[in-house]
Amino acid sequence: MPSGQHSAQTTKAGAGLVLGLGCERRTPAEEVIALAERALADAGVAPGDLRLVASLDARAEEPAILAAAQHFAVPAAFYDAATLEAEASRLANPSEIVFAYTGCHGVAEGAALVGAGREAVLIVQKIVSAHATAALAGPATLRAEKRIQAAEAV
């Protein structure tokens, strides 16, 4: 396992999409799951396309993050702040406030990108609820397909 990563046991192999999640401590699982489902809907993908839920290692025991992984029947991976911060140049929504609290400029986007790999892109930029954030990363080809579908729909 790469340095900086802690992973739950794998439960299924997916299509390559990674859901990055961040949340305040004790955020209700229902809120995180609803936000995660919104991210998937925004991308126009099915829950079965998801292969991983990812977050900051400080949230490795956060019930809401673990519940989201269980809800989608995918493993959860947790990365340290330095690993997420290495993705800062690829974030769509870097935050100095998040950096002050966590040591990285973006939890949801950073975790999604780390989990999806070096060639991945953000499919859904950070979206927020009252107490959580979510982002979706995956192959650049998926983002291109979504742009083509959107253009054809017009």
UniProtKB/Swiss-Prot annotation:
Repeat among keywords: no
InterPro entries reported for this sequence: CbiG_hydrolase (IPR052553), CobE/GbiG_C (IPR002750), CobE/GbiG_C_sf (IPR036518)
Alphabetical UniProt keywords: Cobalamin biosynthesis, Porphyrin biosynthesis
Top-level taxon of origin: Bacteria
Pfam families assigned: CbiG_C
Pathway: Cofactor biosynthesis; adenosylcobalamin biosynthesis
GO biological process: cobalamin biosynthetic process; porphyrin-containing compound biosynthetic process
Protein name, UniProt field: Protein CobE
Source organism: Sinorhizobium sp
